[in-house]
Amino acid sequence: MAERKAARASASYLGRHIGGPAVAWMPLTHAVIGGSLGLGVRTAFGRVLSKIAASNRRTEVRYADLPDAPTVSGSPESGVAFGDLGLQGRRFVIEASSGEQIDEVLGETGAMDAIRVYVGVESADTVEERVSLAIEELNRTGAFDRSVLIVGSPAGTGYFNYIPVEAAEYLARGDIASVAIQYGSLPSTLSVGKIPLAIEQHGALLRAINSELEQRDPADRPRVVLYGESLGAQTSQGAFVGGGTDILDELRIDRALWAGTPFAGIWRRELLAGGSGIDDTVFGTFASIDEYRNLPQEDREAIRFFFLN
């Protein structure tokens, strides 16, 4: 309404001072004013996005100090600068479970300090450099010597849910490592444009990890487990599009849990459609744990890859 009134007033002004009927000037005034309003909206929106992205560099009091444990990124021994991990990365590495914490909770002794590797989007300029940093960190911390390696694809802000990771750390008595690489600093709803980059980066990380595993004796390889939720689930699965379930074996992926995969996820739709290279006995879609428990034991034991809706 406001745009229409402004266009009419401008058309009348041009008609009076330049000549011609006002109606003849209407298409031009609509285009100019509409474009100006659109530019204003885009400018304002851009400022909002910049402010949101800037929060990635914000330092919280609780997570201001470098972690002491050499088994996490951002520590004095790490090749990844603590300040470049971003808000979510700093939270993730500092919350790593120590062997002492695990022993205290479980009432046992002998637990290890869990390994957490994280590379921020500001840690390096390119996908190749960030993946290289992650592999260097995995080797530095001894992650490939652990029994389990969790590979996560974070949400748009870089958030990698520490709760399932922490649960796994306790179950494994600390004999576990986890790794994630940030690809953006905006919420998932505003990170759709980053999906291709996130998929490329996650796929590159998985291939690099597989190359490391190839150099080790099978008995000395960690079990590789994937985890992702929401946009992280979609970008994790995006690395497998067109590869069926066979690609999981090719990359030596032992297990996976994806929570809340968006409908836009292509690979899951490919699996459900069936076809060459797809073994429908190794994956399942569930809305609750009861659905899984109600399956015959043989079916439960065959499932390695879980879609939780």
Predicted regions and their residues:
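Catalytic metal-binding/acid-base residues of hydrolase active sites
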Residues: 156, 232, 262-263
